[in-house]
């Protein structure tokens, strides 16, 4: 049993709740901008007979199961991410969901945004995901279509980006399954 002294009908609780709901709605609106940014590429994807990254994720997940997005605002207003028209979320969709009844970490290159090119904060997002995988012994599924490193920012990601490849070897050594499905180009990785 969890004991709490919170008085949910108190004026201060109601005010805190209202203030937090405003912030949550602002957060969700930013997440929606990322999704909308990716969806602008839909005509290109349709022409190539491809699904958008968000649709790939939906097709992968068990029907009626949940997906917990992680680090969805990675890189907010850093580098090329202006927080508005070019909001990127680290150029990937990452989170925990169920595939064939198994709880997994899923990472989807968001190739609808700048070809899924990797950014500094996208690398940090992937490294944080690897920590969660190791701690919770979650299988990793990656849906990959990426232009590789953003060449204009390559010096910012080269060293830390290499750690993501080392993490794959560590996961393998730990007996944690890793699966990558490549949907198009996968430059340098």
Predicted features and spans:
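Terminal-region recognition feature
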Residues: 1-179, 183-189
């Amino acid at each position: 049993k969890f004991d709490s002294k919170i008085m949910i009908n108190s004026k201060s609780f109601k005010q805190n709740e209202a203030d937090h709901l405003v912030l949550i709605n602002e957060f969700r609106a930013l997440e929606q901008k990322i999704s909308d940014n990716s969806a602008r590429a839909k005509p290109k994807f349709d022409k190539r007979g491809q699904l958008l990254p968000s649709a790939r994720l939906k097709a992968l997940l068990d029907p009626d199961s949940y997906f917990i997005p992680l680090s969805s605002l990675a890189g907010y207003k850093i580098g090329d991410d202006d927080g508005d028209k070019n909001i990127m979320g680290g150029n990937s969709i990452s989170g925990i969901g169920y595939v064939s009844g198994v709880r997994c970490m899923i990472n989807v290159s968001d190739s609808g945004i700048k070809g899924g090119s990797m950014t500094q904060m996208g690398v940090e997002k992937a490294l944080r995901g690897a920590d969660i995988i190791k701690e919770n012994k979650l299988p990793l599924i990656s849906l990959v279509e990426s232009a590789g490193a953003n060449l204009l920012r390559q010096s910012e990601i080269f060293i830390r980006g290499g750690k993501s490849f080392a993490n794959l070897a560590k996961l393998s050594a730990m007996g944690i399954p890793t699966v990558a499905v490549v949907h198009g180009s996968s430059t340098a990785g």
